[in-house]
């Protein structure tokens, strides 16, 4: 409807994006780990999608104030330009003030939602969420300062008042507003929908596959996956990593104890292979090595002689696969039965505790730790499961406290404020259950990207709750004796329309993630579009 207002919002959003990258670079200089990665390619689009929401709310509310001013004091003003500078100043100031309070709550919850990415075990997601949170703050700052200033400085378009903003009550607004007369029906329908969603939530699984983080359109990645699929002869081995004076009497004793522990463990298969088993096999064909090993005894010189030889060129030809370059670390490889991620995590925890106890009892300065691809994947998967609970729970608690605090201040009554805050919070939690339920029913898995979908749903969804409840309170103040249907219908017809436009831009921005070459980001975009629609 107005290219000027559209340009104002978009230009300020672009400036905010530039400031975001500048701040990210400054934080990097100050020592904060901010790594640019593939996920950050989508940050400008996401900031545009979310940031336009704030500008949209401000512009829509200012135009609404101008319309109301003409209705309250008819002077034949038919376009936006017909208003005097003073009238525009009053409308811009009032619209900005009324919007900024709700936007402040919205930006805070949005930032909390994206900062919940810091609970993720993936560094690229930590940087991704932090940068977006910084960007949202800059966009909010410009939306309530620079945007009103530009609207005041630049003359408005000769846009007819009736076309500047559609605030007429339509059939959809009337129907939504009438729902306040049948709260029981709304609750029953919500429960009926929530039952299958809760069952789907119970079926939701955690899944993590490193292959999803590779772009298989790149030739070198295709070759890597081909080698992994076609030429891998056995499952990836696990490793016991022994640090300390490996080539010593105590080191040999600890090595034997670790091998015995691995061999006796019912969940391991095959014979563990390490430096000493390799040396025993090689001594039959190497007379010099055989002489050194035959001379091993209680004196340290014999062990030192063997260590010195192992670090020579001939020795490294034998020991390089199991012994590092200064003989201070060795690995013992072994196999374990294929387990699911939870069983693997439990296996790692139990075996690590046993090996740590063996190292402590050895009497020397040794450590023994476990490693291996399957253990890493199990640990990452466990972190994903924990992060889903921690991030969602943290954001839910912060939002509940914030809603209770805001309503307590407005109502000037702790009990009524707590009750209203809790009532506002319940629909948000229902949306989280629905989102996770849909993921479970459709076969989506929680991974390192979708782990924060619950927190983001709460963070962005509370925007709509705050905007609508704030507008409802304004309508109550304007017409305290009116019917609740009138309050809700007017709120939906005005703020509700702006919320719908904001939801469209946000969903459109996140849907762009479907063009990402990374499967997890594609899934994240798809799930979040559903989450935004449900939150609205």
Task: Give, region by region, the residue ranges found by the protein language model.
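A generic short-segment signal for beta-strand/edge and adjacent turn/coil regions
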Residues: 176, 182-183, 206-211, 288-303
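Structured non-transmembrane domains adjacent to transmembrane bundles in polytopic membrane proteins
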Residues: 217-406, 428
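Intrinsically disordered, low-complexity regions
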Residues: 77, 173, 177, 211, ...
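Juxtamembrane extracytosolic/periplasmic "stalk" immediately C-terminal to the first targeting helix
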Residues: 211-217
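Membrane-embedded transmembrane helical bundles of large multi-pass transporters/channels
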Residues: 1-208, 360-536
């Amino acid at each position: 409807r107005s290219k000027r207002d559209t340009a104002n919002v978009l230009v300020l959003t672009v400036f905010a994006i530039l400031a975001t990258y500048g701040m990210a670079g400054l934080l990097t200089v100050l020592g904060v780990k901010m790594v640019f990665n593939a996920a950050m390619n989508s940050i400008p689009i996401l900031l545009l999608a979310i940031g336009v929401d704030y500008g949209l709310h401000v512009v829509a509310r200012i135009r609404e104030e101008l319309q109301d001013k003409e209705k309250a004091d008819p002077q034949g003003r038919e376009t936006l330009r017909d208003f005097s500078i003073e009238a525009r100043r009053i409308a811009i100031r009032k619209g900005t003030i009324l919007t900024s309070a709700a936007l402040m709550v919205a930006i805070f919850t949005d930032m909390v939602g994206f900062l919940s990415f810091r609970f993720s075990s993936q560094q690229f997601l930590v940087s991704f969420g932090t940068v977006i949170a910084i960007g949202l703050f800059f966009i909010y700052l410009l939306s309530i300062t620079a945007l009103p200033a530009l609207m005041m400085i630049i003359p408005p378009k000769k846009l007819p008042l009736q076309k500047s903003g559609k605030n007429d009550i339509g059939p959809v607004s009337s129907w939504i507003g009438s729902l306040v007369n049948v709260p029981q029906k709304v609750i029953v329908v919500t429960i009926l929908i929530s039952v299958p969603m809760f069952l789907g939530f119970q079926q939701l699984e955690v899944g993590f596959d490193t292959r999803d983080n590779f772009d298989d359109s790149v030739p070198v990645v295709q070759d890597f996956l081909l080698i992994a699929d076609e030429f891998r002869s056995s499952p990836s081995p696990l490793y016991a990593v022994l640090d300390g004076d490996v080539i010593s009497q105590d080191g040999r004793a600890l090595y034997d104890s670790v091998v015995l522990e691995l061999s006796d463990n019912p969940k391991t298969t095959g014979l563990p292979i390490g430096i000493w088993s390799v040396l025993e096999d090689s001594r039959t064909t190497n007379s010099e090595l055989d002489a050194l090993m035959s001379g091993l005894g209680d004196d340290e010189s014999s062990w030192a002689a063997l260590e010195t030889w192992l670090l020579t060129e001939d020795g490294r030809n034998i020991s390089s696969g199991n012994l590092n370059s200064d003989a201070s670390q060795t690995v013992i490889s072994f196999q374990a039965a294929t387990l699911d991620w939870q069983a693997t995590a439990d296996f790692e925890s139990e075996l690590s505790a046993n090996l740590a106890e063996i190292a402590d009892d050895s009497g020397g300065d040794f450590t023994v730790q476990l490693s291996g691809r399957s253990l890493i994947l199990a640990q990452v998967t466990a972190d994903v499961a924990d992060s889903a609970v921690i991030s969602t729970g943290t954001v839910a608690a912060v939002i509940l406290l914030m809603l209770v605090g805001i309503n307590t201040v407005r109502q000037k009554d702790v009990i009524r404020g707590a009750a209203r805050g809790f009532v506002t919070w319940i629909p948000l939690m229902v949306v989280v259950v629905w989102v996770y339920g849909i993921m479970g029913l459709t076969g989506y898995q929680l991974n390192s990207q979708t782990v924060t979908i619950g927190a983001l749903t709460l963070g962005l969804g509370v925007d709509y709750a705050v905007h609508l409840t704030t507008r409802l309170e304004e309508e109550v103040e304007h017409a305290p004796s009116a019917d609740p249907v009138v309050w809700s219908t007017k709120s939906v017809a005005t703020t509700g329309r702006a919320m719908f436009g904001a939801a469209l831009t946000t969903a459109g921005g996140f849907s762009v993630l479907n063009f990402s070459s990374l499967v997890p980001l594609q899934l994240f975009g798809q799930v979040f579009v559903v989450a935004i629609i449900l939150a609205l």
